[in-house]
Amino acid sequence: MYKRCNKKVTCVSFEETFKKTGLPIITLYNDCCALNFLVDTGSDVNCINKDKLKYLHYTETNKSGNMVNSSGVNKSNVIMMPINDKHGIAVVEFYILDLSIQFDTIAVYDGVKIDGILGSKFCKNAGLIINYNDCKIYS
């Protein structure tokens, strides 16, 4: 599910987006493509908006599952996708969902475009500590 290729203590700030939205949103990269992820410990798994896939490098898997969101229950395929920041790279499992309506609503009201969700399994496996007072995520 999560494989860190080079392990270091990292710190990522979400202060700017938190001031705009009240949500912990961080920017990570897939090669040179910037992706804004909502860090959502209420979500079990990681999700990527299907509209973004045409711009990304990833590996398809044979795995799929039923996902529950505001649109109901949907079957979702799973991909493995490398994401990185200035501290290193990780290959992460993502469920593909059409989250355009939900993410576009946040973009209209708060001015921040979200491309995906990093869920609680990612946070646990990466050893993340979310500090809302400092608006930083540590690993």
Name each model feature, range by range.
Residues 1-18:
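Short glycine- and acidic-rich boundary segments immediately preceding or forming the N-terminal edge
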Residues 131-133:
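Short acidic-glycine loop/turn motifs at beta-strand connectors
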Residues 47-50, 126-128:
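Short hydrophobic alpha-helical segments that form membrane-spanning helices or hydrophobic packing faces
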Residues 16-38, 72-129:
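Aspartyl protease catalytic core from the pepsin/retropepsin fold
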